[in-house]
Amino acid sequence: MQPMVMQGCPYTLPRCHDWQAADQFHHSSSLRSTCPHPQVRAAVTSPAPPQDGAGVPCLSLKLLNGSVGASGPLEPPAMNLCWNEIKKKSHNLRARLEAFSDHSGKLQLPLQEIIDWLSQKDEELSAQLPLQGDVALVQQEKETHAAFMEEVKSRGPYIYSVLESAQAFLSQHPFEELEEPHSESKDTSPKQRIQNLSRFVWKQATVASELWEKLTARCVDQHRHIERTLEQLLEIQGAMEELSTTLSQAEGVRATWEPIGDLFIDSLPEHIQAIKLFKEEFSPMKDGVKLVNDLAHQLAISDVHLSMENSQALEQINVRWKQLQASVSERLKQLQDAHRDFGPGSQHFLSSSVQVPWERAISPNKVPYYINHQAQTTCWDHPKMTELYQTLADLNNIKFSAYRTAMKLRRVQKALRLDLVTLTTALEIFNEHDLQASEHVMDVVEVIHCLTALYERLEEERGILVNVPLCVDMSLNWLLNVFDSGRSGKMRALSFKTGIACLCGTEVKEKLQYLFSQVANSGSQCDQRHLGVLLHEAIQVPRQLGEVAAFGGSNVEPSVRSCFRFSTGKPVIEASQFLEWVNLEPQSMVWLAVLHRVTIAEQVKHQTKCSICRQCPIKGFRYRSLKQFNVDICQTCFLTGRASKGNKLHYPIMEYYTPTTSSENMRDFATTLKNKFRSKHYFSKHPQRGYLPVQSVLEADYSETPASSPMWPHADTHSRIEHFASRLAEMESQNCSFFNDSLSPDDSIDEDQYLLRHSSPITDREPAFGQQAPCSVATESKGELQKILAHLEDENRILQGELRRLKWQHEEAAEAPSLADGSTEAATDHRNEELLAEARILRQHKSRLETRMQILEDHNKQLESQLQRLRELLLQPPTESDGSGSAGSSLASSPQQSEGSHPREKGQTTPDTEAADDVGSKSQDVSLCLEDIMEKLRHAFPSVRSSDVTANTLLAS
């Protein structure tokens, strides 16, 4: 429908020239009123009304003026003619005024009717809004509005004609605006009445014209609104029908899903892929739902609200779509969780590593923990790992920390079955899992995957049955205890590879070469920072066992400096130089070499008798005294400190972890003969160690080490104990005589206070003479000379190594005062520096006393347990010891019984009884000495008693 446009009419029209001529005529008539001719004056004052709205005819006036101007005064006949004409015109003017009054009344009524009708139609048009949000109702509304527009359109010609009449009337009778309002007089002139009527008609015509334009514009706008609303409703209806069909299909597919518990584990990846494809296939529905909701929102903005039926349908579609999305997401999550928990790479198979009442659970960061339903407790350690740690406590009676640590690691190695894993196999697994980058951070799942592949490969290569879940779980537990005690669930790849390489069953040299390659650059060179990182990772292994203090503590900087002495001043070190340093068995890495010797010595039998316990053959390590002839000690007696009267451990002793050869026997014979002529003062003056010591300076660890995991609350206590032990070891290395005065040499000795040499089957054995007996060697002078020459070469090599150690000790001891001087020079106030130094010394002295008191209490407990065992052995019946060669029977037998059974030794005390008496007497002396010292310490430091009790409790736990 085309919009109806009404032509505007000028309601205030300019006056025509006839109306202006009439005004001029009135003006000239007034000027001629002074004329002496009354006829002319009457004719002038009575103008004729205008003809047909064209104004007053000017012809008669012109003739009149012309006659007057031409011939002067009119003649009487002419005057009468003019007077008659004036009367006629006056009569016509009166008629015109009456006609004008009737015409204005005829315009006012139609205009008012038009105004009322337009107002009514405008109200009817407003009543059609708002539209209903239904297609049928909107179509009905569209038809109604079309009829309404036809009605308005049909009324248009009449309205146009009335407005045109009003325009014509106003053009004939224009009006002037009132300048100032004035009170209307009772008698208004005809001109004023005409002005008022014209003004009223103009107002009515203006209102009617505005209402008409407004109505026609609203009709057009509402028509467009109805058309647009109908299109949107049709689009919404079609989209909802399509969405409903698609949702029904998707819900049908969802109904065919099987429960997760009924699915096979192998089919889980296929179901996961199917769910992902299903999700992608129905992803366009998201756009359709969004389109429908947007259209509904646009209609709401246009004040068109969906009907109840359409609203319910739209709400149902939204609900179904959300339910479908939730079900698909939940299904995918369940499948992924099932695949993670039960799939090939899951931890579900590890649940079989524990037995009832234990249960294996997983924390949010995938770290396993264990629940004891019977005791209703939880712990981080596997039950088998807890039992293993309890068995490790049995090895605490070993006096020498390197062997104690190695023995503990050997038990852990066997429990984890890592002694069966070769480094080559481990490297293959590392490469398969892309662990070449040592800076890579592994999570628990990656560690489990690597360990699982490692043990499965072990089964394939060795053809043995391995409890893979148990081994994987315990290995994971041990790795977390060593490198992630805070259970963050993350560890560096270098840490993982270091732990596996240290415990695998491979030669020490290969292990060290591999570990060095992990921190070396492309040129097989390593700087101090990376070497410090490697040593820091390696020292975590004994640290987890509580043995780090004996290996220089957690500060690896002194070890790095010691190693870089082989670099000849270069900022980097090569692999050969690193191996040369490690072959000297430095203090921080000696435990790894001892572990290797412990592993080899397990299967070795020495065809000789232990001089203390009489065990024959000696299994494991064999220790030969280089001070006395024919004195051999088994590893049990040696490591636990059992010794006879003449076999003091501060004398040189040779360790064998392989069967001895004739050349080794001859060499030891010559060394023993030489030591026979040396006094005890010589050995105390020339102390030698079985490892390369590292001067431990109390300094800040400025080497760059990886960030450690969060520690548990008791970690600070362990750090303090470690610090005290390190300082105590430093004081002992500075010729501290405290323990030498209070304890016997057998009780105070540790592995760094005697010469313990180990015989290597590679470096110390001569193959040409390995199978010859001592008697045959003695008969051949040439062979004897060669052996003596080899012995001298070995001694020369040992002496050179000792000389090198002494030089390093001297240099490192010289570095320690320089560090102290550097820190002193930094002080600005001398007096404050003295006070700080004095306070520091007092603090150190107090720490030394606390540490000594703690160690003395431990020694006292050990002595009490030894005395208790001796009493039990002495109280045993004599019949149980007859014919026995064990230590227990020897200790239980009396001197009289020994004389009766061994007449050849009459008049001599048996070595076993003499050793028992010696141990008993020394134990009593030591106990008295300890009690005296403890009493003095308690009086000197009464305030530290509670802290010592707490520390002892933690150590005992």
From Swiss-Prot:
InterPro entries according to UniProt: Dystrophin-related_2 (IPR017433), EF-hand-dom_pair (IPR011992), EF-hand_dom_typ1 (IPR015153), EF-hand_dom_typ2 (IPR015154), KCMF1/Dystrophin (IPR050774), Spectrin/alpha-actinin (IPR018159), Spectrin_repeat (IPR002017), WW_dom (IPR001202)
Alphabetical list of SMART domains matching this protein: SPEC (SM00150), WW (SM00456), ZnF_ZZ (SM00291)
Sorted UniProt keywords: Cell membrane, Cell projection, Membrane, Metal-binding, Phosphoprotein, Repeat, Synapse, Zinc, Zinc-finger
A Pfam family annotated for this UniProt entry: ZZ
Record CDD domains: EFh_DRP-2, SPEC, WW, ZZ_dystrophin
SUPFAM superfamilies noted in UniProt: EF-hand, RING/U-box, Spectrin repeat, WW domain
Low complexity bias: start-end ranges: 877-900
Annotated segments matching region Disordered: 877-923
Gene Ontology terms: cellular component: dendrite; glutamatergic synapse; perikaryon; plasma membrane; postsynaptic density
Spectrin repeats: from-to residues: 102-179, 231-337
Tissues in which the protein is found: Detected in fetal brain.
Residue span, WW domain: 358-383
Modified residues (Phosphothreonine): 910
A molecular function (GO) term: zinc ion binding
Positions of post-translational Phosphoserine modification: 748
Protein topology in the membrane: Peripheral membrane protein
Gene3D superfamilies per record: 1.20.58.60, 2.20.70.10, 3.30.60.90, EF-hand
Localization, UniProt: Postsynaptic density; Cell projection, Dendrite; Perikaryon; Cell membrane
Subunit structure: Interacts with PRX; this enhances phosphorylation. Identified in a dystroglycan complex that contains at least PRX, DRP2, UTRN, DMD and DAG1.
Function in brief: Required for normal myelination and for normal organization of the cytoplasm and the formation of Cajal bands in myelinating Schwann cells. Required for normal PRX location at appositions between the abaxonal surface of the myelin sheath and the Schwann cell plasma membrane. Possibly involved in membrane-cytoskeleton interactions of the central nervous system.
Protein name listed in UniProt: Dystrophin-related protein 2
Organism the protein comes from: Homo sapiens (Human)
